[in-house]
Structures are given as structure tokens and as C-alpha cells.
Amino acid sequence: MTGLLERGEGRLGLFGFGSSAHMILPVAVRRGLRVYVFTRSTSKAEAAPKMGAEWAGAPMAEPPCKLDAAIVFAPAGWVAVEALKKLEKAGRLVLAGIYMTPIEKLEYKLLWHEREMKTVANVTRQDVREFLEEAAKAGVRPRVTIYPLEQANKALIELKQRAPPGSLVLMVS
């Protein structure tokens, strides 16, 4: 996706630190990447270095260095603009969400110097197999909190107030 995993070196930014980023972080670290996490959640920012991130902070914060690539999981267009600002020349930005609010006022200078922005629309079964194999080697163990469908409101409140690590799943019985 970003080209960094294939090289086995570089500085990767993860914007949004939910389920997907939690699984990508240890894989990227295992492959030799230096990972920088951007999240609005204080608790997630505190957890990221414990999982191997070099640095963690808010999306508007300046990391200690420019990034070679970044993946935006957050569904907010303004976060993509912030990610572009943090890229090195010829850096690649991957928009990984299936939905995002509009990206407003994108200044051309953020794309200048051969920066690249792409989306991820299709993932093949082989892509998933390869990632799961790599994730297992990196010791990734997804964290899942299961709620019965009848407790959906409780799950949403918990997600908003506490944002537990990993995924919340509603079980339909």
C-alpha cells in the first residue's frame, strides 16, 4: 500500500488509531519501520508507544520528523490534509477508509514535490491471507469486545466515552 513494507525501512504515520491501525502497527514495526501515531484520544496516544510506536500525538501536532508515508484511517477529510503536511518530498498518502468527509481547501503545494495520494478500494483474498500471515508472525492478537445487539446503545456510549482498544462487535442472536 505505502511501499514501505516492501523496502523494510522508513517512517510511517498512522492517522487514527482504531482496530486497523492497532493491527498494522506491530506488523510495520516488525518489518523495520519507524511508526508515528496520530490520534485525538489521549488514552490511545499513551498506548501507541507501548505497542512500538516511536511517537504519538494529535493529528495537528508536529512529529519529530517528516514521514515517508502515511495511512489515514480517520473518516475526516481535514485529517488527510494534516497528513499531507507531514509528508517528506515524494511521500505517499493512503486513504484507507470506506467513507470520508470532504477534503476542503487542498493547497497544491501539499502535493508538490511528487507527493502522492491514493485510496484503497479493493482488497483481494490473497491480500488478506498475506496480511494475516504477517500479522501472526508479528504477534498480532485482535482485541474484541462483544455486546449483544440489545446493548447497542451501551456499546456506542462506551465507544464514544472510553474508546476501548480493538473492536466492538454487536452480536445478533
Task: Name the predicted role of every residue range.
Residues 38-42, 73, 121:
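N-terminal Rossmann-fold cofactor-binding loop
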Residues 41-43, 77, 100:
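Helix N-cap at the beta1-alpha1 junction of Rossmann-like dinucleotide-binding domains, i.e.
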Residues 30, 125-173:
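C-terminal hydrophobic helical "lid"/dimerization subdomain
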Residues 87-89:
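Helix-to-beta-strand junctions that scaffold the AdoMet/dcAdoMet cofactor pocket
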Residues 13-14, 72, 95:
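Hydrophobic Val/Ile/Leu positions in short beta-strands of Rossmann-like dinucleotide-binding domains
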Residues 62-70:
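A short acidic, Gly/Pro-enriched loop at the edge of an enzyme's catalytic core
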Residues 1-60:
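Mid-domain Rossmann-like dinucleotide-binding core that forms the NAD(H)/NADP(H) cofactor-binding site
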Residues 92-94, 105-145:
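Rossmann-fold dehydrogenase core element
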